[in-house]
Amino acid sequence: FRSFDVALRTGKPQDSSLIGRMIGHCPRYMLASPDYLVRRGSLTHPRQLVEHRSITHRAWSEWLLRSESEDYRYLPDNAHMTDNLVYARECAIAGAGITLLPAFLVEDKVEKGALVQVLPEWNVEGNDLWLAYPSRKLNSPALMSYIEFAMQFDEVKRYYVGK
């Protein structure tokens, strides 16, 4: 365990020696390139994901989708796995399959038409962004000032909407 002052992380810290403050929530989207969907066909229901190639981040081995009337859980079984979201995005742009990505990584790619949303009527489980820091009694005033600053940082809040 290395010493640190503060960290940004997705998901609530599980370590009881850490204090966590949620900054906000970032939506994720299911996306593919227009070329991929022309070649492989569009989807009308998440059940059809088994007929498609998935590009999956190791931390998101389960895709939880929700429509107005139904919840659906998809477990990609023969997915192209990665631990790099930028790589997953670039694979999707290149037509390698369907992926889930956070809003901050895809906004410009969707605007330019490099990626399109798959099953837009279905919501994908998003991510919470947390500020984590040790629960030491004597955290420095500089650290506490930084934490207060980070909690107000508008560029982060542009993608992570408070709950």
Q: What feature does the model see in each segment?
A:
Residues 34-35, 86, 104-105:
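Alpha-helix/helix-capping structural signal
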Residues 103-108, 112, 122-163:
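C-terminal effector-binding regulatory domain of bacterial HTH transcription factors
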Residues 20-23, 77, 112-124:
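Short beta-strand->loop
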Residues 5-9, 97-101, 117-118:
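Paired acidic/hydrophobic, glycine-rich loop segments that form the ligand-binding mouth/hinge
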Residues 89-114:
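A ligand-binding cleft/hinge motif common to bilobed small-molecule-binding domains
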Residues 21, 47, 89-90, 144:
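Alpha-helical segments flanking ligand/cofactor-binding loops in enzyme cores
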Residues 76-82, 86-87, 92-94:
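Conserved, function-defining micro-sites of small-solute handling proteins
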Residues 1-82:
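Acidic, Gly/Pro-rich loop/turn segments at junctions of secondary structure
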